[in-house]
Amino acid sequence: MTDVLKAEDVEAAADKAKEVGAFDANTTNTTGAKTKGDVFTSFNVDDFSVPRGRDEDWRFTPLRRLNGLHDGSFPGEHAPNPVTADIPEGTSGVHVEEVPADDDRLRAAGAPVDRVGAQVFASLQRGTVLTIDDNTVVDGDITLTFTGTGPDTTSFGALAVVAGEHTEANVVLRFEGHGNYADFHSYSIGTGAHVNVAIIDDMEDDAVHLANEQLRL
């Protein structure tokens, strides 16, 4: 036999849940969003509150192990992690640039969704832009390797992947080494493009790596 819930039963249950504090329809998470489709974003670190263990987006994160990346108490800043590029031999139409922190392409896909991502742009010294020209088909992997600056150091990075129309490419992002590292990935993908991105996080056990990602099609 099947039980049928009436509308008034559902409403009564919802009212009861509110009474006991199960949820509050007007409660927002630390990003200021009521739903995942309404996430607050900003490049300004001061627009975000410091995450707490009871915040919904952070309650499963051991904040003490983030070494201050979430609240600004991280160890002294150092230069961005060195980046090396491995592009298949004979490939044309693929460009890797080191750019200043104010390069618009680093922000083209949107703003960070949390305080750590915004801290990247507050502390960023330079970034990396990978551009794949229109109609370029890459045979093999484009690999970018980011190497930590060392134990008890902190660095920040930003990567923009700009894929033109009707491109085909596989991009591998590899992270290795020691240190605290926060970065932001901006993906701007053109019409008809097919781009696969694989992330290999092979940093040492004493390292901390946090990343924000935004995609624009």
Question: What kind of region is each of these model predictions?
Answer:
Residues 1-217:
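Glycine-rich and polybasic anion-binding loops at the starts of cofactor/ligand-binding domains
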